[in-house]
Amino acid sequence: MSAKSTAWVQTALLALALFLLNLYICRELFRIEYLPFMGSIEGAFIGISRYIQAHWSDLTWYPLLNDGTPFPTTYPPLLNLTVALVASLRGISIAHAYHWVTALAYCLGPVALFALVLRLTASRWAAFVAGLIYSSVSMSAWLVPDIARDLGSPFFPRRLQAMVFYGEGPHVSSITLLTLALLCLDLAIAKRRAPYFLLAALAFAATATTNWLGAFAIVLIVVPYALAQLGPRGWTWRHFAWLALIGVAAYCLAMPLMPPSTIAVLQMNAKSTGGDYSSAYRSGLLWGSVILIALAAIKTAMRKLAPHLQFAVLFAFLMSLIALADAWKQIAIVPMAVRYHLEMEMALAILIAVVAHALLRDRPRWIRAASLATLLLALIVPIRMDRKYARGLLRSVDIQSTIEWKTANWLNHGWTGGRVLMPGSSAFWQGAFSDVPQLWGFDQAVTDYTIRVAEFAFYNTDPAFPQDGEDTVLWFKAFGVQAVGVAGPLSNVVWKPYRNTKKFEGLLQPIWRDGPDDVIYRVGAGPASLARVIPRNALVSKAPLHGLDVDPLRPYVAALDDLSLPRADFRWTTAHSAEISATLESNQLLSVQMAWHQGWHATANGKPTPVLRDAIGLMYIDPQIGGPSKIEMVYDGGTEMRAARVISLLTALLLVAAFIVSFSSASRSRKRPA
């Protein structure tokens, strides 16, 4: 066997060893359908994947959460699309497929890191050390006491716990893709050929469309990488031009799955998802300037070191600063900064491996071998503890015994109305078991911010407030909620949102109970239709100042409660189109209780009519005609989505054409006689 073949075999065996190590740790996850951690947000991802599997040809509008939302806004959809595809191809449930896909991403993470460090250092053993540390040592638990307490021991695997207990499957998957994306970028910059350009653009697009934290982490890894290349023999403007072109191409490819309006929604919600991060936006320019100055200073101090060593230090510094400033000092440089501790673990693994390689590279072979053997021996106990922890963590649950499943099952068989609002974890999991639409699902996908304003009020109002229940019911009716679930102190629902769990007793009719503390109430007695005929002067024309300001809602809700008004029949014709039939008088219009989006269009009796937005973010149509009216509504995403599809398609065609030309040129060069 040639030396080159031997090297390839050694590389493959080391990569396989890392994969098998992680498989050893989390192997049960490949077989599990449902885990017992119902507070995990993975229920929402399973629900979206379930919807995808049932609507492959119609993924435009998602009507099941947040009063309806564009499909790309539900969540970066690549992982959910992959889960639905795996479930269909393998003939397994969506929940099983979700765990199978995320387990695979977990096992491939250290393999991807191995490939990246191998590319940067040209050392298989440095790459193996990076992958080994990333697989078996949770450095965030050693650096952040709260994480160690959450795990139970700093020796336990944080990456696995975050993925399984909290539902960080998309985040963990995006880190795997991020590592591969930087590898592809390094190849593309070095080779400057179309095939590598295509791979890099695809890898970055895949990262961004898997998880929003992963999308922002692209910036956090590319900036240190590019800065490390500066120097007398480093990058020129052409290299930066290639980098910019790859970034533009990646976004153009991803644009239909993350259009500008979706990014704007994310920015709006990120200010208050998981905490108050408005200060991070206000101080963003200041922190950005400070960080760039710090990176430049570190770069200057290390200017004589190899670029890969500079990158390792710069990347580890940046990720540690972001995660630890939040964990230690509660300084959020970016929204949800502490969640970047998973990227920090990867960065520190790179740093340790690269520094060790630099220190031992010129040492005798026996010293390098002894150092590696010492590391392997030292990691035996942590690996065994990881496995013991995983064995206790990765256990199945009878899903039909959970309150989340029972609630959704009753909605499937006992509920004949429209939109509902379930509490806490039942809302996370509702889409996994049911097609009944809900007011909420999770905060990141809310396009109508008034929903979040109202939710804060009806969950957190002081029980002593005299109109607490009545005002909450006004909000419910305004947003088309026809049933509401409440979880009391004895409920098994994870995260019980209502401060006053008795606020609806005697006010609303209970229609389902499970034990003493889980109850669903009916809201109002009106029809289930999403379209309602109301007088023009009843439209909500003034935005409430806050969640307790319900006076602007009163005329609108009074019209909704007025059963003498004409009935409007709303019927979905596809997942993104509907028909409304109603008889209108000249002073009446149609209120459609879905979140407004500019991508909706309508015709009234065949003539175009605008779809307008009221003061609480819902749609209304004012055809200004009397008598029988047939309204046809269609969602196509509007000009933005049409442009996004065209741009993405043209970018893909250009990249494929460049790939073909490059491949043909290379083939002709090989055939040309010397």
Language model segments and positions:
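Extracytoplasmic
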Residues: 24-25, 49-53, 372-448, 545-547, ...
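Membrane-interface alpha helices of multi-pass inner-membrane proteins
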Residues: 184, 196-211, 223, 246-253
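Start-transfer (signal-anchor) and selected internal transmembrane alpha helices
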Residues: 1-29, 373-374, 653-674
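Membrane-interface helix-loop-helix junctions at transmembrane boundaries of multi-pass membrane enzymes
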Residues: 2-5, 192-193, 232-243, 294-320, ...
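Active-site lumenal/periplasmic loops and adjacent helix-entry segments of GT-C-fold
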Residues: 18-184, 206-216, 389-398, 420, ...
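Active-site-proximal, structured, solvent-exposed surfaces of multi-pass membrane proteins
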Residues: 552-671
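Signature aromatic-anchored transmembrane alpha helix within multi-pass, membrane-resident enzymes
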Residues: 245-251, 357-384, 673-674
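Membrane-interface transmembrane helices that cradle and orient dolichyl/undecaprenyl
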Residues: 173-174, 178-196, 232-233
